[in-house]
């Protein structure tokens, strides 16, 4: 059995521009604590791997302190960590993926093509790739098929499935179905999705782990994924410290109206 945590879209150092400056600064500080909560969870429940599918930073040039804090938190995890940078935190020579000293248990994919990293103790291979600019119009999964070598193959990418906008790593359904991956860990979509099976590949987005505004409502977190004898399950893990909600008053609801009329 293999157990891993799938997360994405932390967007550390977001501006929180809708808030007053003091509150925005407080929210940024709180956001940096997310990785520490994640580390506590990983160590408490014995996760084997952590897969982070991009946009951990809100830009490719966050405060150095933020990168160092994230690296320190990931270094506390008693698990191997894999990261595929996305369109906000794309890899470049001056990005935190190059300038921050990442701990030994963290592997950052830096190539714009799929790279394979073996996890021999788990008979597992992780395939990942990085955005190397703010846009990625071509699919990073195009033409890929995992070898039939008896190992379990997992993909880690930032992107969208059948996206109308072909700018952020669009992946076609037929590419996922032909990939031979047992699981495709995705980022970019901030709303958690139910696992989708294409061919033999299970695809999922965990959504963002912390809402940043009223366009990101409800519970937020990551996915606890279990691979056991070919069976794959993905369960939601709440991680958010705060939750955005919209309150609706029914005080002035008229007799012919329903609650849906107010929403």
Predicted regions and their residues:
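Short, well-ordered strand-loop elements centered on a beta-strand within folded domains, enriched
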Residues: 202-203, 230-239
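Conserved small/polar residues in nucleotide/adenosyl-binding loops
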Residues: 251-258
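Short hydrophobic/aromatic beta-strand or adjacent loop that forms the aromatic wall/cage
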Residues: 220-222, 244
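His/Asp/Glu-rich metal-coordinating catalytic cores
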Residues: 49, 58-204, 208-219, 226
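Short, charged, solvent-exposed linker or helix-capping segments at domain edges/interfaces
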Residues: 16, 137-140, 233-236
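Charged, glycine-rich active-site and insertion segments that engage polyanionic ligands
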Residues: 236-250
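N-terminal active-site segment of His-dependent metallophosphoesterases
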Residues: 1-68
């Amino acid at each position: 059995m293999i157990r891993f945590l799938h997360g994405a879209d932390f967007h550390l150092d977001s501006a929180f521009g809708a808030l007053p400056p003091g509150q925005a600064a407080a929210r940024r500080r709180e956001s940096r604590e997310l990785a520490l909560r994640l580390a506590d969870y990983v160590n408490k429940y014995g996760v084997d791997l952590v897969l982070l599918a991009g946009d951990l930073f809100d830009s490719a040039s966050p405060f150095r302190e933020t990168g160092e804090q994230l690296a320190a938190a990931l270094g506390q995890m008693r698990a191997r960590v894999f990261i595929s940078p996305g369109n906000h935190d794309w890899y470049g020579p001056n990005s935190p993926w190059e300038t921050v000293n990442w701990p030994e248990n963290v592997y950052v994919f830096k190539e714009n093509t799929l790279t394979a990293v073996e996890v021999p103790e788990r008979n597992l291979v992780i395939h990942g790739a990085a955005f190397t600019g703010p846009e990625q119009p071509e699919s990073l999964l195009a033409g890929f098929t995992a070898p039939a070598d008896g190992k379990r193959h997992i993909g880690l990418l930032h992107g969208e499935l059948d996206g109308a906008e072909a700018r952020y790593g669009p992946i076609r359904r037929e590419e996922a179905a032909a990939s031979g991956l047992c699981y495709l860990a995705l980022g970019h979509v901030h709303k958690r999705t139910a696992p989708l099976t294409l061919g033999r590949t299970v695809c999922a987005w965990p959504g963002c782990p912390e809402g940043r505004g009223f366009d990101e409502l409800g519970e937020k977190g990551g996915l606890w994924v279990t691979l056991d004898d070919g069976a794959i399950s993905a369960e939601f893990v709440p991680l958010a410290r705060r939750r955005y909600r919209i309150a609706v008053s029914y005080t002035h609801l008229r007799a012919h109206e329903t609650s849906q009329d107010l929403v």
